[in-house]
């Protein structure tokens, strides 16, 4: 109030008013400030001042022919004065209004296509639902998030080439469009943008939004997918949050989510196979996510998640240098250590060999629901500052940090034996043994850790062994903070190596990732994941294994039946029969296999007993290592639907049902495909179904040209000879019969003759 009175007083003196209104602003510093550089120093003032003028806008001279001098109200729309310093005319804001209402209409067909990301955003917001506002302390941590919903995942360079090709197709310059996504997008956009009148520069900007993932390092408390980030300013403040459900999903979020699920499933499956690395690569290469090859997505998608990074490492791609332990991402922020093997005794006097990190180090730990700063020395936790969503999440972080510290009191807190195994039934390494043990029950660990008095520090609070907060006491070195710890912001990627057991190491040999670190969380993928590899058949349970195995046999029947007759051992060892073995009761697998193999051998030896349906039905049972026994079976058991179900050796059953009339096979009531030939030819020898009507003359004869496939035989004229490829690359010479009457005998002799011709 005093100040205002004083100012009023000053202003009442006429001299003051005169000085303030008449004095020229000739102070050099002020003039410099407002006139140097192109940058506007006070944009809002400048705007207000300009708009107060009559003609604040300049326009091309042509405007005078297109816009009348006055509008309906008689207001002047443009001035006859030229703009100083250019050949443009001065225009009133009213001219803009006139133009918007009465100006020429252009086609709007391209707008939704060009401004696609904006139109889609409006739709998402229109259909989104905003819930109540809650006032509470927001623990935000900075995370690298995707700020651009609805984009493809091209690299900046790839996108640049696509944009140049679409917007400036005739510009000179080397552009190589190699990836499938580049070619598809270019073709699609060129078609969409025919006769487009929107300025090329604008089109280029908008295309960039659509093609490239843009990330920012932002403080986030809730969801991190791009449809949440686009409304971040509406959903979380410093002390409030507003519930929001997006009104639509975007493909890039769905790709990220589905990629994580596919990668987890693949790593889990590969870990239990005989050669994890080879299996993992085979699965990554044969899997599609939403119709795109998984390996293409891995090359372009920057998602950082343990399983995804293991897949990337296997493909030789660079990944982040942070490492993972107990589901937390650790990044060393200072210090260093050397590693040394040391033997330690648990509370149960079990000896563990652990790799001890000697030296002082500081780490940030970032998990899904908690974050922390950890300072540690050799086998000693110096300080842990943790923050999390709830008690449970904070406890998880504390356990991981205590185990990671390798302190003696932690190892002594072990009660009972440590014998945790992974999915492949191999013992876990000692650090993961300890982790699993305390994740199951941390009571003794927390009780034995030790308590200390604490100082009152702003924003920090103590935590007792039973996880209750306290301002006086806390577990030694451990504090809970209201502030979160930011995620590691760098996007730097490093070269890594991966061993046969999927352990990923940096170039110094530090383990960054291993299958133990892959989350067991199950989720439902947003996009369809198609695993073509037989290793993934079991992901949907026993029924899926059953159906897939028989579908595979039917799809590959031409090759399968040839192998069946000529190289059965190779056929039995096919990896496609591996998943099926888990359905056959362990105790009897060997006997079933021996029985079926003997039965098949009899079929091969005794002409005329070849029965397609029976071979298909029993083949998967022959894949197990056979036990020789005199046992005969009339039915074989498989474990599906929670109990043993029977497959009849002769005849149909609910599990395996072949309909002779429709030639369709149903497995547990599900359609498994159609057989292309009639399986009920009692006499049909292996190739006979195919070679009826041909006489087998003997070994290949080069004079009759290159070998034809069985399907090409139909083109031969009667009496014509040709070489034909049968089986695994065996070639025999045949002649098309002149008379049809003798066709029947071919069936019986074909098998014998093929064998003789080959041998």
Curated annotation (Swiss-Prot):
Gene3D superfamilies for the chain: Polymerase Basic Protein 2, C-terminal domain
Subcellular locations according to the entry: Virion; Host nucleus; Host mitochondrion
Positions of short motif Nuclear localization signal: 736-739
Site label Mammalian adaptation, positions: 627
An annotated Gene Ontology molecular function: RNA-directed RNA polymerase activity
GO cellular component entries: host cell mitochondrion; host cell nucleus; virion component
Transmembrane portions of the chain: none
Keywords: Cap snatching, Eukaryotic host gene expression shutoff by virus, Eukaryotic host transcription shutoff by virus, Host gene expression shutoff by virus, Host mitochondrion, Host nucleus, Host-virus interaction, Inhibition of host innate immune response by virus, Inhibition of host MAVS by virus, Inhibition of host RLR pathway by virus, Inhibition of host RNA polymerase II by virus, mRNA capping, mRNA processing, Viral immunoevasion, Viral transcription, Virion
InterPro entries: Flu_PB2_2nd, Flu_PB2_6th, Flu_PB2_C, Flu_PB2_CAP-bd, Flu_PB2_middle, Flu_PB2_N, INV_PB2, PB2_helical
Subunit structure: Influenza RNA polymerase is composed of three subunits: PB1, PB2 and PA. Interacts (via N-terminus) with PB1 (via C-terminus). Interacts with nucleoprotein NP (via N-terminus). Interacts (via N-terminus) with host MAVS (via N-terminus); this interaction inhibits host innate immune response.
Protein family membership: Belongs to the influenza viruses PB2 family.
Name the UniProt record assigns to this protein: Polymerase basic protein 2
Gene behind the chain: PB2
